[in-house]
């Protein structure tokens, strides 16, 4: 009974891996087609070499066959390096444009907000709140730019490392190619996972910062409302003074005359 869930989980993992690999193959179908063409060319050269060896003239072709395999392997390595370099080049070309567009959107929103300050000031949204929001957007953009630069630098470093690893000897190139490709795939998968987690952390951090700023703005609004209520109560007028009624003065009669001085 316990083995059935394990088998199911193993099948689900295999299906997920197969789905990921199929998605990667669909995304990189042009490179896959080129790789298949290279394999077909190598196989064709190998078959021609076998046929010529069977005919008796395979001495020259036997010498040329390793050279063809080496050139095909080097061309494959060159194309793999170009595909690795294409990602940082795309990031370098389109990353600043995306950052510029996001900055334009932020500046437009800030301008609109500052244009409606006369409407928002009674609600308690002061210019300091808008300034804090704008600074948080700038900080998030700077973090995204630094993350893209770090990823580009790491990709360039790895591409250089792998390009140096292909050079030492021809036999080692042919033997270590699958291991290098496997290590490269694992490294790319690890980097994409780290990048996705970093982006998720960045989005969460910006969301928390925005919520904190909104909470501070609402608290400031309530404080301003309370202060305005206190001011309105103070400026509504002084408390009513107790005036002496006239009836009391009339009932008591006229005031007694003052005593005259001896000179008068």
UniProtKB/Swiss-Prot annotation:
Highest taxon of the lineage: Eukaryota
Bilayer topology annotation: Multi-pass membrane protein
Keyword vocabulary terms for this entry: Membrane, Transmembrane, Transmembrane helix
Region spans: Disordered: 227-264
Coiled coil: none
Transmembrane segments: 31-51, 74-94, 133-153
Subcellular location: Membrane
GO cellular component: membrane
Tissues showing expression: Testis.
Pfam families given in the database record: WBS28 (PF15164)
Pro residues: bias regions: 254-264
Keyword Ribonucleoprotein recorded: no
Main location: membrane
Biased composition (Polar residues): 227-236
PANTHER family: TRANSMEMBRANE PROTEIN 270
Protein name from the UniProt record: Transmembrane protein 270
Organism of derivation: Mus musculus
Organism taxonomic ancestry: Eukaryota, Metazoa, Chordata, Craniata, Vertebrata
Gene coding for it: Tmem270
């Amino acid at each position: 009974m316990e083995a059935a869930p394990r088998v199911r989980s193993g099948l689900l993992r295999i299906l997920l891996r197969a789905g990921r690999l199929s998605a990667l193959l669909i995304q990189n179908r042009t490179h896959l087609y080129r790789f298949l063409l290279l394999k077909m060319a190598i196989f064709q050269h190998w078959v021609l070499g076998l046929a010529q060896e069977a005919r008796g003239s395979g001495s020259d072709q036997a010498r040329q066959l390793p050279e063809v395999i080496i050139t095909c392997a080097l061309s494959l390595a060159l194309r793999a390096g170009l595909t690795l370099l294409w990602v940082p080049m795309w990031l370098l070309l389109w990353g600043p444009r995306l950052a510029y567009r996001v900055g334009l959107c932020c500046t437009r929103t800030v301008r609109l907000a500052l244009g409606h300050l006369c409407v928002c000031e009674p609600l308690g949204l002061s210019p300091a709140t808008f300034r804090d929001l704008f600074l948080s957007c700038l900080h998030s953009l700077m973090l995204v730019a630094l993350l893209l630069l770090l990823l580009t630098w790491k990709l360039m470093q790895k591409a250089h490392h792998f390009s140096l690893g292909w050079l030492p000897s021809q036999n080692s190139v042919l033997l270590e190619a699958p291991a290098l490709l496997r290590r490269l795939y694992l490294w790319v998968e690890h980097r994409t996972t780290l990048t996705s987690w970093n982006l998720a952390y960045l989005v969460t951090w910006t969301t928390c910062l925005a919520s904190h700023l909104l909470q501070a703005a609402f608290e400031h609004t309530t404080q301003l409302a309370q202060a305005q209520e206190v001011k309105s109560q103070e400026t509504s007028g002084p408390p009513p003074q107790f005036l002496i009624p006239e009836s009391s003065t009339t009932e008591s009669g006229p005031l007694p005359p003052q005593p005259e001085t001896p000179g008068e």
